[in-house]
Amino acid sequence: MINHRICILGGTGFVGHHLVSRLAASGYPCRVLARRPERHRDLLLAPGTELRWSGGFETDVLKEQFRGCTAVVNLVGILNEGNGQTFQQVHVNLVEHILAAAQAVDVPRYLHMSALHAQATEGTSRYLRTKGMGEDLAHADTGMQVTSFRPSVIFGPGDGFFNRFATLLKITPVVFPLACPDARFAPVYVGDVVSAMVRALADPGCVGKRYDLCGPRIYSLKALVEYTADLIGRRRIVIGLPDVGARLQARIFQLLPGKPFTMDNYLSLQTDSICGHNNLAELGIQPQTMEALVPGYLR
């Protein structure tokens, strides 16, 4: 086993589960922070994995969690504000705490999960702007060896994209009204994303880089929803809403429990989630297609 313990924030989520498994398979012991570790004991099946309770993400708390680690991975992010969490707190303030804590206990390496087209000033939504602010903060800190990753929508077993649309399609009768149907995505496989992160850990040449990660093909949102409906055997007429309808849907849906669609989501969709240059190839990774993988887990 490699003598480098990796501390992971957000390790109990979709990408986190896949990353812990891949790191363990590559010989890296992991320390995963969780507010409710008893709910995530499955992570302990990965050899060398330690699951720690974390009562908060303040600098002093994180210093103790990071002690003895050689790298920190931050996968924490939210798509909507609520439950006392704001984009500023999660995407910006947390990064400040991580950097301060890591430097205080001499952790040299930091991997940061950002988002495709995250830009501090030019982002079309608060989500993208705060993601950009956090990313810029990390790269501006000369005391850390930083690599960030900017994926398009990520798919794979347990994802929140195809599985979510599958659930919505199952409960929607006949007609499925879709906001922003022409928004474009290049869905990237979670296995390719975590491969990029593991390779970056081992390669000093990745320090300081910001990697855009995309799948090999581009699709409209409408095409992805129709593909999902076909896979789960639901005949639905997917009707793209005009812009005024999309805005109205967002204003109504953001008032519902769970906020299935918000105005900030709408604004994020005004920027196509596609790569100008896909950096997976630079990392020696051949991106896998959704057609080869999604049918294996979506029901």
Regions found by a protein language model. Name each.
Residues 38-42, 47-97, 101-104, 116-123:
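NAD(P)H-binding glycine-rich loop region in Rossmannoid oxidoreductase-like domains
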Residues 199-262, 275-299:
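Mid/C-terminal beta-alpha module of Rossmann-like enzyme folds, strongest
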Residues 167-188, 192, 196-207, 212:
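A conserved pocket-lining segment of Rossmann-fold NAD(P)-dependent short-chain dehydrogenase/reductase
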Residues 2-28:
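N-terminal Rossmann NAD(P)H-binding glycine-rich loop of SDR-like oxidoreductase domains
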Residues 88-92, 124-135, 155, 159, ...:
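Short-chain dehydrogenase/reductase
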Residues 148, 158, 181, 186-194, ...:
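Conserved loop-to-helix N-cap of the C-terminal "lid" that shapes the substrate pocket in Rossmann-like
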Residues 114, 136-160, 166-167:
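Conserved beta-loop-beta element that borders a ligand/cofactor-binding pocket
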Residues 9, 33, 75-76, 110-116, ...:
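SDR active-site strand-loop-helix element
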